[in-house]
Amino acid sequence: MNHRKFEKWSPWILLVAVVALWQLICSAFNVSEFIFPSPWRIWTQFWEFKTIIAGHAWRTFWVTMAGFGIAIVVGVLLGFVIGSSRLAYAAVYPLMTAFNALPKAAFVPILVVWFGIGVGPAILTAFLISFFPIMVNIATGLATLEPELEDVLRVLGAKRWDVLVKVGLPRSMPYFYGSLKVAITLAFVGTTVSEMTAANEGIGYLLISAGSSMQMGLAFAGLVVVGAMAMLMYELFSAIENHTTGWAHRGSQNG
């Protein structure tokens, strides 16, 4: 197996090794399934409750995608405004940083009061926790446009808007796709956290229900499903990134 193939398969090799070690430790030390279930127990619970898990997983998925979609729109618009103006960058960026430092789980009770139990708090929590990386990366890509390049374009007759749209935004695409891969995982976290306290369905609700009934295998199966959905979306954005912004990674690919 050459280096490139090994690099491609390395995550799966590591995953299999971790699962095998996990199973070995649980079997060797007779770990209680009520404390730390083995991979085999998690699989049996997953298969037994696969229909129920699928229903909760679908709810978590589409709610996450709704919040994530809003985050993309708001993040790109805010990032464009902040990155295209020094005044906006100086005025808005510190406030957004302070807002991002607030624990998003603390917003869930407030959102429940405003919107009630259901999809509203989950969608908004997914949005609140995931828009910041998108905004920051778009703003960074625009704000770090080389002054020399901008001067040359101005000499050639380009206006400020032309520079931002035709040069700044394409240059920001690697930053944008990088932010999507981070933001989508955060969106799943936000949805799951909200569902644990403000929903009657979804993987977060399943985790609370399984934990309260001491079904640790089912709870871990729910966690695995969330991780799998996040990983699939991450790989999807990675594939799109490689096909659309391969020029930005040619140096690392050749190395």
Residue ranges of predicted features:
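Hydrophobic alpha-helical transmembrane segments of multipass integral membrane proteins
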Residues: 13, 17-21, 54, 58, ...
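Periplasmic/extracellular loop-to-transmembrane helix junction in inner-membrane transport proteins
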Residues: 2, 28-72
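Short cytoplasmic-facing helical segments at TM-TM junctions of multi-pass membrane proteins
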Residues: 134-137, 141-182, 207
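Cytoplasmic-entry segments and transmembrane alpha-helices of multi-pass inner-membrane transporters
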Residues: 77-112, 136-143, 151
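Transmembrane alpha-helices
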Residues: 124-128, 161-193, 221, 226, ...
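Hydrophobic alpha-helical transmembrane segments of polytopic membrane proteins
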Residues: 204-241
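Loop-to-helix entry region at the N-terminal start of transmembrane alpha-helices
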Residues: 55-63, 113-134, 177, 218-223
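Short cytosolic juxtamembrane segments of multi-pass membrane proteins
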Residues: 241-255
